Amino acid sequence: MSDYTIAAVDDVPDVLGDYPGEMRMFTGSIGAEQVAFTYRRMPAQTGGKGGYGHAHRTQEEIYFVISGTLQFKLGDDVVDVGPKTAVRIAPPTVRSVWNEGPDDAELVICSVRLEDQVDEHEMHEGFWPQ
């Protein structure tokens, strides 16, 4: 018997609450044991600019922009990333993502799945001033 799971975006809870856009963490919903997989929709003028950034202790991430153009602040660099483009970010690199607009942007974030996320994340308040 084959072992697989299928889930549509609307099958996975949006963890952003009242914050504009969507962030849907598929990992648990599909029972992924090794891969962390997150879908995010970012309306114009949303993201981490004017706020925080984050880094990881051990977890490498790959961000894949599906549609729109996003600004990534990666350490001291700010780069524009368009559709159908992947960005690999090493664990200690502080990062944040911003959608300047005018349209919504969609992206997927992939990494290795970790059981203990609490000690993995390092928040950096004021990382990307406006």
Where in the sequence are the language-model features?
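A short, N-terminal "cap"/entry segment at the start of jelly-roll beta-barrel domains
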Residues: 1-37, 43-44, 52, 120-130
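Short histidine-centered beta-strand/loop micro-motifs
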Residues: 27-28, 49-57, 98-100
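Short strand-coil-strand connectors
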Residues: 31-33, 73-77
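Short, conserved beta-strand element in jelly-roll/cupin
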Residues: 40-43, 55-72
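Structural motif
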Residues: 62, 69-71, 78, 94, ...
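Short acidic-glycine-tyrosine-enriched beta hairpin
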Residues: 76-91
